[in-house]
Regions:
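Ferredoxin-like alpha/beta domains used as RNA- or RNAP-binding modules
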Residues: 1-238
Length: 238
């Protein structure tokens, strides 16, 4: 059987800061394998359990929980210690009452927050692609790697409130003037803002969003924001 490309481990000094790992422990740490989120924007499930939320103390304990199907991401058991957990993913563990959602916070790319059990079956996903396939149907791609064939009218940059793991779209949140957005990357990561204007991209400039943070305004690429509601966030993100 061919070996999956890529190393199973990573030097601790090279790991992203948002993983929350100690730099003075053993030399290597579990890394992310190709999956729903890109390597630089996700946390390996084993690292998440041991270092981020500290529910276990050793890699062996993390492996036991994961291999025995005790860890669910978006309602599906994930049995790989290399599975990448990323933006807006909902994580629950068998026998533990706390449920976590990963969001940007205080300039950090990803941090877990505890959410109510009533929210574990819903997730916000950002539309990253639209493709017309056979018979005129539309395939929609989302930021977490999932895709869906649907007649729902959406545009790239919009967000969808999705039922998981069924992958049913409950509501569409368009990226438009007046939308409430969450900055997902950069120095303003984790901050909520109101969209004042959407500026279409040009040959040399990407699509941009003019955002209001109350007493200040900034203009950033629309790729760095995610719609989370109209006036207020429709799910818990803090």
């Amino acid at each position: 059987m061919p070996r999956i490309a890529g190393s199973k481990k990573l030097k601790r000094q090279m790991a992203p800061m948002f993983w929350g790992i100690s730099r003075k422990s053993p030399r290597f740490v579990t890394t992310v394998r190709p999956g729903p989120h890109s390597k630089q924007f996700s946390i390996p499930s084993a690292v998440f359990l041991r270092d981020t939320i500290k529910l276990v103390t050793t890699a062996r304990e993390a492996e036991y929980a994961i291999y025995h199907g005790k860890v669910k991401v978006d309602g599906v058991s994930r049995k790989s210690v290399h599975h990448g957990i990323g933006l807006m993913d909902v994580v629950e563990l068998e026998g533990v009452s706390d449920i976590y959602r990963l969001v940007p916070k205080k300039g950090h790319l990803l941090e877990p927050i505890k959410i109510k059990s009533t929210e574990k079956a819903v997730k916000l996903v950002k539309v990253t692609s639209k493709t017309t396939i056979r018979k005129g149907k539309t395939q929609i791609g989302f930021h977490d790697g999932r895709s869906l064939i649907s007649d729902t009218k959406v545009s790239v940059g919009d967000s969808c409130l999705m039922q998981v793991p069924e992958q049913k779209i409950n509501e569409v949140l368009p990226l438009e003037k007046g939308s409430k957005v969450l900055v997902t990357k950069g120095v303003n990561a984790g901050q909520l803002a109101d969209v004042k204007e959407i500026k279409e991209g040009t040959f040399v400039l990407p699509k941009r969003a003019l955002l209001s943070f109350g007493n200040r305004e900034i203009e950033i690429p629309s790729d760095l924001v995610m719609v989370v509601g109209k006036k207020e966030p429709i799910i818990q993100i803090a």
